[in-house]
């Protein structure tokens, strides 16, 4: 699923995401329900504020870390042949999808942290990330022949920059609304939660491909 910036209407988006949003908002609101926003334990399976971040951003970071751990654990034993495996000539490889996750996050960085319009990428970023972002035939031809560490390094490089940038922002920024986003009025929290949800979508695809990969 390649839904970086969906072009469907806000009504359709809300209809499709209502159940997920209900569960997500219950998690997001946890830090605000009590009198304190004390950082929770620095444990992977504890969602909540984190030391070094504002309360809401820390909660987002804990969700980002949890989902990334799921992805990395799932692919931890894959060899190059498995990363390059195609179910059919229209499919995407696991390797390409890992690069796609890194590309998506990089483009959200540029938009969110640099204040650029979607698609207003530098030549350097376009050259490095556009093929992975688009997937499809170009990615099938270009993204192959790499070992797992190549993809983990790309994911780690991008994520490190995201976390450093988020440390310099506060909850007011996270809750600020972009009235010109294609989905309709959308805050930075929703955009970055989409990065998490996007990884979850592709995690299912990766799991399916791995179940069909010759042993």
Question: How would you name each of these model-derived features?
Answer:
Residues 19, 69, 73, 77, ...:
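A generic structural signal for well-ordered alpha-helical segments enriched in polar/charged residues
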Residues 32-41:
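Bacterial Sec-dependent signal peptides at the C-terminal "C-region" and cleavage site
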Residues 56-59:
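Short Lys/Arg-rich basic patches
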Residues 77-84, 164-176, 211-215:
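Surface-exposed helix-capping loop/turn segments at secondary-structure junctions
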């Amino acid at each position: 699923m390649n839904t970086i910036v969906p072009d469907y209407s806000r009504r359709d988006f809300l209809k499709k995401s209502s159940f997920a949003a209900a569960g997500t908002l219950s998690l997001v609101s946890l830090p605000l329900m009590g009198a304190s926003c004390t950082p929770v334990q620095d444990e992977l399976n504890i969602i909540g504020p984190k030391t070094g971040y504002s309360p809401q951003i820390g909660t987002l970071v804990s969700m980002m870390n949890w989902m990334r751990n799921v992805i990395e654990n799932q692919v931890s034993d894959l060899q190059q042949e498995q990363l390059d495996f195609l179910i059919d000539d229209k499919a995407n490889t696991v390797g390409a999808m890992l690069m796609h996750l890194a590309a998506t996050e990089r483009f959200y960085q540029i938009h969110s942290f640099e204040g650029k319009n979607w698609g207003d990428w530098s030549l350097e970023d376009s050259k490095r990330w556009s093929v992975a972002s688009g997937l499809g035939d170009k990615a099938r031809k270009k993204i192959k022949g790499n070992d797992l560490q190549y993809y983990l390094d790309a994911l780690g490089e991008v994520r490190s920059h995201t976390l450093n940038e988020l440390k310099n922002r506060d909850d007011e920024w996270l809750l600020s609304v972009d009235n010109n986003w294609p989905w309709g009025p959308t805050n930075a929290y929703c955009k970055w939660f989409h990065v998490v949800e996007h990884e979850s979508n592709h995690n299912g695809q990766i799991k399916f491909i791995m179940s069909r990969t010759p042993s």
